[in-house]
Structure formats: structure tokens, C-alpha cells
Amino acid sequence: MVKETPLHSSSSTSLSSLFRPTKLKNLSAKIFNGGGNQSYSKTDDVSRSSSRSSKKNTDSDQEDQIKYNKPNDRRSTIGKSPQGNGALSKESHVVASSTLTGISPTSAKKAPIDYSPSRPLPNNHNPVRTGHTVPHLPHSIHNPINYIHQGSKDAFHHPHPVRSTAHSNISTVSSAKSDTPSSNLSYQAHMHPVEILQKQIEDKHFMDSQASTPGSVELQHNSSSGSDDTSSRKKKSLRLTRFFKKIHNDYHDNHHHHHHHNRGSTPTKPKLNLNTNENIVESNGKALYETDNPVELLEKYGIPGRKLGEGASGSVSVVERTDGKLFACKMFRKPHLNNEGTNQSQLANYSKKVTTEFCIGSTLHHENIVETLDMLTEGDTYLLVMEYAPYDFFNLVMSNLMTQDEVNCYFKQLCHGVNYLHSMGLAHRDLKLDNCVVTKDGILKLIDFGSAVVFQYPYEDTIVKSHGIVGSDPYLAPELLKQTSYDPRVADVWSIAIIFYCMVLKRFPWKAPKKSFNSFRLFTEEPEDEDDIVRGPNKILRLLPRHSRTIIGRMLALEPKQRVLMNDVVKDDWLVSVPSCEVDPTSGDLVEKPKNHKHHLVTEEELNELTKQHGNKDSN
């Protein structure tokens, strides 16, 4: 296990203090103030992909015990629906530099976009539907990298003529050369934008810490070896099951799903204790957190509302600002410390995981991916603030109200969201029903990037393999259980096909992709002839709509090298012909509402009522 310099945060601070010597307010890490004279620069190298530094899983006799990197964590990153329908501010976003001072979203202006890419990645000519653009990051003496995303064109731009000579899996900050880690360093010329922001945060943590030990401090990048062990799930059937702890008494118990709020009363200011693992819940259902200084969170985002759900790494609540706008706020759970000797290492890994998730989320801007807006810190506790969408996709599937046209619309949106993600050199690795939410306009959004990894770097053709079993059993690609390394792109493709199967049939095809399960074993066997529906792919495909079978069959190819990639999935003739809902990337308004379907949006309480009514009919 590599080491990381421990964090020594003040008791009440916001992550923007990473870039500001004065009292911390918050990190609006992505807002660029084009009207000011502020100098912006990316700072240092970052950790390479987790798939390069992760410990390989060599325990072949433990194949049947499936490990999770984030077990049961459906809502551990973003609103365990209901999420919210507050429109995002449409200011441009960039990654903050170490010289960034406080910039509010309301005062931000759009920055110019560089349209002169020298060489795109091979997979950047995909038909990507974008919701936002990431403006040009100005050059500086510390910033040889220029990152842009411009629609379906070039996700990465690298004008610097010098290729990086250091191609390490783990970033190294030398404290022997200088008192500060960023004063005399060579910067990687081929880093992913996610890693650039990650390194800025790490450098500030390094400087804020009082550690003066000479030598190098090595940082592990997003371990994917499944350290959060959970025993294999044993289900009685293939019925769809959540993989997180759902808070059944959700936000809608006290709020109408059209969000008509009572403005007449002033809510009591809650006490926030962000350094405790347990939340205090009063009789009114509000989830309260105690802290000595809750003003920052309350002033910017409002009072935390009812807890929506929780997973292995934290819990998510909805917050309502004074103007009525809603946000999803995730509080990451501080790890239990075993002993004094391991405290620093555990805290370092914890902060690394949280900031990595923030860095990935804040890099992505697309209509089918939830927006990551801000990160706040209180001591050793982190709060991640995200766009809020009101409807839980798992609930929508389980409502049994979806028409096939509605299913196809959601599937197309999901494919475009993942295609965009892959075009940015990132793989999700935990795609499932639980990690999708839906807006009031029927726009599906991907959430939870805690397991995401970089598989391709700017200006490079190499695909970086991933390691470790990450995800939930039924959605896993079979190679994860057999190989020590795998291509995370095609693992995502497999998971999307399983999601489509679940949407259509309301059940899983198998408990896990292992031949010890009869359903999967029959799927892998050679059919006796082309009409054999017991063995081979037809066992699954015959149950799906006819026009979808060709592309789903290619997505479920057992051999990873034969599996179709997302840029080809979105070009499939059937998928292209599917009418789907789209929003305007500037205004956020719905620009296309297909006439062949409408979206049946139900809340948790409405689903419970439908289930109760269905149960009464069955009993009669």
C-alpha cells in the first residue's frame, strides 16, 4: 500500500481553501471569471489511472466470491431519488488552478473555447450528444496542457510539442527539492484533465500538511481491487433488487412531487455535525448534521432535507436553497479508524477517493450525466453537491408503467451518456439501474462515479486496462471474474445490455455471470442449431424486441474483443431510429418530445401505492 501525506484540515473549511489563503468559503472549482485579470493555471502531475496502480487480483480460487469496490452503493454519490428539477446555472466550467481565488457562479462569465486541436483521440469522432462545453484553459508556465471538449469533435487537445518522459502509474511529489511541491516540478504533458484537478487538490493538501519528511510521497490512485469486501449476494430469485440501502421515508413524504413548497414558514436552522457518522433526525423528518460553523453550507445551498438514501461510503440528502432551487448533497462517511498507526493512511485513502470522485464528476458536462457542482469540507468530512433530479430510475422500471417506446427512449439516452463518457477517456464501471435518475422532462442521467477510471489519456492511443471486480453481480461482464485485467469500455457495454434486459423484462437474466448459475451456463453453450432457444444467445435475445436483438447480441458477446464499442452502438440503425427526448444544452429546456410515448414518472410513495393496489388485486 502506497502512502499519501495525511490531511490536516481545520475543523470547518471548504475545499476552495485549497486555492485560497484566506478563510475558506467553498470550491466552485469549475467557474471561470472571464472578466477578471486573474491568472489561471493547472499545477502539477497527478496520479495515473487506477487501473495502472491497482493491485492485481491473483486469487483464482476465490473466483466465486465476488468483491465490490463499492457494494450496495446505489445512492452513495448522487441523489437517491427523488432528486430535483432545479435547472443548472449555465455558466461555463473549467478546472480551478492553485492560484484561483473565490469566484461565485453568479458572477462568472463564459470563457472562450479553443478550436485548434492538433490531434484528437481515435475515439473522439463519435456522435456524442453534449450538454455543455468545457472552455479553453489558458496556457501558463505551469500549464503546458490545453484541455477542451467541443461536442463530438475533440475531447482532448494537446498543443504542447514535448511528450512526457515520466509515465508513472503513481504520481510522485518530491519535497526534497523545495518546500512546496509545486514550486520546482516538471509537469506531465500527457495527463487527463481529471488528474490535473486531482493533483491540484493533492498539492494543496501536501502544502497544508505540516509534514516535512524528505523524499517522495506516493499517492495511490483510486484503488479498484475491491477492498470493500462484501460476500456474494444470495437471492431467492432473479427479481430486480436494489444494491443500496434505501431510505423509504423519503423527501416526498413532506413535499409534493411538483415541488410546491410552503414559503410562509421559516425553517429552523439545523445543527450540523459533519464529523459524526450518525445523523440526528427530528420528528419532522429533517436529517440534521452538527457542526460549529454550518453557515457556509446553509448560506450557499440551504438546509439539508430528508435523507434520500445511503450506501457504503456515505448518505445523500436533498437541500433547498432560499430561492427554492434543490440540490443533492452527499456526505461521505469517514472510515472507522482501527489504530493510531493506520489512521493517517486510512484518512489519506479516504480523502483520495472522495476528491477523485469530485474531479471526475466536475469534468463531465452532458445532458445525460448529472452535474457535479461543488465540494465542501468540514474537518475530515466532505460534502459533494450535485444537480438534483426528482425520479429514481429503479422505481420507474419497477412501476411496470413503461411502454416499449419509453424503454427505448431511456436506453438511447443511456447509450449517449456512456458514449460521451468513453469519448472523454473515462469508464464508469458500475452501470446499473440504481445509478440512473430521471428529470421531470424524462431525461435520464448517470450518477455515481466513485468507481470510474481513466482508460485513455490525451494524445495517446493506448487503452489502459482495469483491475479488480467492481460493480454488482448481475450487471458484471464475465471477464471480470476470470481475468486479472480487462478493458473497462466493453465491461460498460455489457452492463448497458443487462440494463436494457432488466427494463424490458423486469428481472435479471442471471444472478451473476458464472457458469455455476444454470441460466448463464446455458447462455454460454453452443446452440444445437439456429432455432435452439435453450442454449446460446437466443436464450436471452428471443425475449427482447426484434429490432433490438442485433445490437444487444453484439453488446453481450462473451469474448471481450468481439464486443461492440459504444461509438458503434450509437450508430446502430435501430438505435438511431429510436425517437428520444433531448434538451437544449444552453437553456436546459426540452427541445424534442417524441409523439410516440410519454414518460410515466412516479415517486417512491406512488410506487408503494401501486404495489399495494397490485397486491390487493392478486389477493382477490
Swiss-Prot record:
Which CDD domains does the record cross-reference, listed alphabetically? STKc_HAL4_like
What Gene3D superfamilies does the record tag this protein with?
Transferase(Phosphotransferase) domain 1
Q: Indicate, by first and last residue, each region the UniProt record lists as having compositional bias (Basic residues).
A: 254-263
Q: Which residues carry this modification: Phosphoserine?
A: 60, 216
Any idea which residues bear Phosphothreonine here? 58
Question: Known SUPFAM superfamilies for this protein?
Answer: Protein kinase-like (PK-like) (SSF56112)
Q: Can you tell me which residues bind ATP? A: 308-316, 330
GO cellular component terms, alphabetically, are:
cell periphery; cellular bud neck
Q: What is its EC number?
A: 2.7.11.1
Q: Where is the active site?
A: 430 (proton acceptor)
- Pfam families (alphabetical): Pkinase
Keywords associated with the record: ATP-binding, Isopeptide bond, Kinase, Nucleotide-binding, Phosphoprotein, Serine/threonine-protein kinase, Transferase, Ubl conjugation
- Stretch list, region Disordered: 1-20, 29-130, 153-186, 210-237, 252-271
- UniProt record similarity statement: Belongs to the protein kinase superfamily. Ser/Thr protein kinase family.
Q: What is this protein called?
A: Probable serine/threonine-protein kinase RTK1
Organism encoding this protein = Saccharomyces cerevisiae (strain ATCC 204508 / S288c) (Baker's yeast)
